[in-house]
C-alpha cells in the first residue's frame, strides 16, 4: 500500500490492484472512491477472483477496518472553528530526519506539503 497524497492510496493485495481516492464535496463531506483494475483479456473466472480479492478490504472487508469510517471519525475529532487549526503531536512536531524507523516525520512532511499545495 502506498499513500501518494492524503487523498490517493494505491494498493496491491494478492492478485488485485486498487486505488482509493478521497474526493472532497464540501465542508465535512467527502466521497470515498474505490477503483479496481484488471486486464481486458481476463477470463470471467479471473475477473470474479479479482472481485473477491478486492472485497477483502473496505466497508464489508474481512481484512481491514473501513478506512472511510476511520477518516470520518478523525475529521470529526479534529474539527475546529473556521479560523482554528489542529495540531496532533505524535512523537514530535518536526519534519526532519530521525535516527530510527519509528517516526511520523514522513506523514507530517506529506501533510505539510498538502497544506502548502492547498494554500491553508
Residue ranges and their predicted role:
Residues 1-120:
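C-terminal catalytic domain of Rieske-type non-heme iron oxygenases
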Amino acid at each position: 500500500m502506498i499513500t501518494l497524497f492524503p487523498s490517493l492510496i494505491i494498493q496491491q493485495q494478492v492478485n488485485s490492484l486498487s486505488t482509493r481516492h478521497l474526493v472532497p464535496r464540501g465542508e465535512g463531506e467527502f466521497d470515498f472512491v474505490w477503483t479496481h483494475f484488471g486486464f481486458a483479456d481476463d477470463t470471467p473466472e479471473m475477473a470474479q477472483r479479482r472481485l473477491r480479492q478486492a472485497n477483502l478490504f473496505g466497508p464489508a472487508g474481512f481484512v481491514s477496518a473501513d478506512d472511510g469510517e476511520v477518516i470520518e471519525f478523525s475529521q470529526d475529532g479534529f474539527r475546529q472553528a473556521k479560523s482554528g487549526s489542529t495540531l496532533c503531536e505524535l512523537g514530535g512536531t518536526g519534519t526532519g530526519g530521525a535516527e530510527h524507523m519509528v517516526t511520523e516525520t514522513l506523514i507530517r512532511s506529506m501533510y505539510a506539503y498538502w497544506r502548502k499545495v492547498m494554500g491553508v
